[in-house]
């Protein structure tokens, strides 16, 4: 839940760009978050720093969806059998590079909180970026 009371006046927060409606998700379509939209409407003083770690890491839009498996990220199929690995290409290096760039942006902008995309192999609290930001002392809230 995105509680407006959880943020200080004028606070800078890191936000997954896809939650703001930017078409940077794997399929290239916008997917804005109504919960985030509501928060920003109630708290216009918040300063948003939008990031897409996967794009920052060098992955294109659109791209094959990624799936976390044992600490790594692999490309998967887009069809109904998306859980089966098609190419199996390991794209972990792109995710790690994007996570490092995201952490740098968060630190440079003095962001203490981040609102990230739930279920993303990158942005989920258990994703590569989510874990890296948590280790850096940044509070993560996942939303969809």
Report each predicted region and the residues it spans:
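Short amphipathic alpha-helices and their capping/turn segments at secondary-structure boundaries
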Residues: 1-8, 34-47, 59, 98-112
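Structural motif
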Residues: 12-13, 112-115
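Short, surface-exposed acidic-centric catalytic microdomains
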Residues: 31-84
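Short, well-ordered beta-to-alpha junction loops that form the rim of enzyme active sites
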Residues: 18, 117-120
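Phosphate/ribose-phosphate-bearing ligand recognition and processing surfaces
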Residues: 121-126
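Short N-terminal binding/cap micro-motifs at the start of the first secondary-structure element
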Residues: 21-27
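Divalent-metal-activated hydrolytic enzyme cores
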Residues: 2-3, 7-9, 26, 56, ...
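Short, hydrophobic/glycine-enriched beta-strand segments
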Residues: 12-18, 50
